[in-house]
């Protein structure tokens, strides 16, 4: 087994503080599952290159706890790892890209501050990855909908999280949902341990997994212990702006936590400040623009079919920024109507930019 025998202990000190993070939001104390006497194999420095000749085994030599923190306080893992120098070389071929890593489990549509907290906890244990499923909507027959974050923009967001994760940006790893849909909770954890060869998982307290979502967080901890990998369960990041009287999302799972559903609702309402608080950044809309999409030298007008992710609701949005490639940002106003997105600048002539290509990807950040 890749990770040596482990003993998983549930951290009994569940801190229920709700400290503000400065944006009207708060963190509940993380419930950390602690490990004693187990070995970690970190993943390769660059999962895509596979050009390393040796994997180092690291040993957890002290437990770690969790506390409620404000945004200025960062919990530190004291004396957690010690490197062993007598490990044999391991073959690179055949290893999964997440081998030896710590995977955060969830649906990472919005890449909001709750998702960021999962990766922060993963980075404190080892190399952080986001493990998610693709093709879920098609398999389950859900109506297709635009993503909150454009696929081409996700790497930028993850890179921005590096400063929270020990200067190491988390990487994404996707699994076809159809390939795991019928797995029992035990089979799913065994896949993580034996096939993907991860050394640990991080999940939220409401995480469900396995066929028909039959497994919960406590079962995840138990199964991970049996498979010799660690599990870290953290409390949900709560949306402190919306009180209990206003939590009307229509979602029975909604207990007031930050979620992709809340982000979608805030976008639909056009509340861009609230969206920024939930995301931990300004919402960025990606447009696919052609030269004929510029009716004037200071305006871009594209149909909704040319946007790559979810726009805010119908309305006029001022104090936005237009970004074209590596060009500096340009102040602009955005008008969203039922069929088009209009972007108008006051000072810069868009026709002066390089439009030699058939189309360009243009970004708009909402203030």
From Swiss-Prot:
Keyword set includes Nucleotide-binding: yes
The protein's required cofactors: Mg(2+)
Gene3D superfamilies associated with the record: HUPs
MF GO annotations: ATP binding; FMN adenylyltransferase activity
Superkingdom per UniProt: Eukaryota
Gene Ontology CC terms: chloroplast
Biological pathway: Cofactor biosynthesis; FAD biosynthesis; FAD from FMN: step 1/1
Catalytic activity: FMN + ATP + H(+) = FAD + diphosphate
Database matches in SUPFAM superfamilies: Nucleotidylyl transferase (SSF52374)
Pfam families: FAD_syn (PF06574)
GO BP terms, alphabetized: FAD biosynthetic process; riboflavin biosynthetic process
EC number(s) from the headed UniProt entry: 2.7.7.2
Intracellular or extracellular location(s): Plastid, Chloroplast
Key words of the record: ATP-binding, Chloroplast, FAD, Flavoprotein, FMN, Nucleotide-binding, Nucleotidyltransferase, Plastid, Transferase, Transit peptide
Record function comment: Catalyzes the adenylation of flavin mononucleotide (FMN) to form flavin adenine dinucleotide (FAD) coenzyme.
Matches recorded under PANTHER family: FAD SYNTHETASE 1, CHLOROPLASTIC-RELATED, PROTEIN-S ISOPRENYLCYSTEINE O-METHYLTRANSFERASE
This protein's name: FAD synthetase 2, chloroplastic
Organism: Arabidopsis thaliana (Mouse-ear cress)
């Amino acid at each position: 087994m890749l990770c040596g025998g482990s003993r998983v202990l549930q951290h009994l000190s569940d801190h229920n503080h709700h400290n503000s993070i400065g944006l009207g939001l708060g963190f509940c104390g993380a419930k950390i599952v602690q490990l004693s006497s187990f070995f970690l194999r970190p993943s390769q420095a660059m999962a895509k290159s596979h050009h390393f000749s040796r994997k180092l085994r690291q040993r957890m030599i002290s437990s770690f706890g969790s506390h409620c923190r404000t945004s200025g306080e960062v919990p530190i893992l004291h004396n957690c790892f010690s490197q062993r120098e007598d490990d044999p070389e391991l073959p690179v071929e055949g290893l999964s890209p997440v081998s030896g890593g710590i995977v955060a489990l969830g649906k990472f549509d919005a890449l909001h501050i709750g998702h960021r907290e999962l990766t922060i906890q993963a980075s404190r244990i080892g190399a952080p990855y986001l493990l998610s499923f693709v093709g879920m909507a098609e398999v389950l027959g859900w109506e297709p909908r635009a993503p909150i974050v454009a696929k081409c923009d996700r790497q930028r967001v993850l890179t921005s999280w590096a400063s929270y994760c020990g200067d190491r940006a988390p990487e994404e790893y996707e699994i076809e949902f159809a390939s795991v849909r019928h797995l029992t909770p035990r089979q799913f954890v065994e896949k993580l341990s034996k096939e993907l060869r991860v050394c640990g998982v991080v999940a939220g307290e409401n995480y469900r997994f396995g066929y028909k979502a039959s497994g919960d967080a406590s079962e995840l901890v138990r199964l991970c212990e049996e498979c010799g990998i660690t599990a870290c369960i953290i409390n949900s990041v709560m949306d402190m702006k919306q009180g209990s009287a206003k939590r009307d999302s229509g979602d029975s799972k909604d207990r007031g936590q930050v979620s992709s559903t809340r982000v979608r609702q805030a976008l639909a309402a056009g509340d861009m400040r609230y969206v920024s608080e939930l995301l931990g950044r300004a919402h960025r809309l990606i447009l696919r623009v052609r030269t004929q999409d510029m009716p004037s030298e200071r305006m871009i007008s594209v149909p909704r079919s040319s946007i790559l992710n979810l726009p805010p609701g119908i309305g006029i949005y001022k104090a936005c920024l237009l970004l074209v490639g590596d060009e500096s940002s340009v102040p602009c106003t955005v008008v969203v109507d039922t069929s088009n997105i209009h972007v108008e600048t006051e000072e810069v002539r868009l026709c002066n930019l390089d439009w030699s290509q058939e189309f360009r990807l243009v970004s708009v950040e909402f203030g």
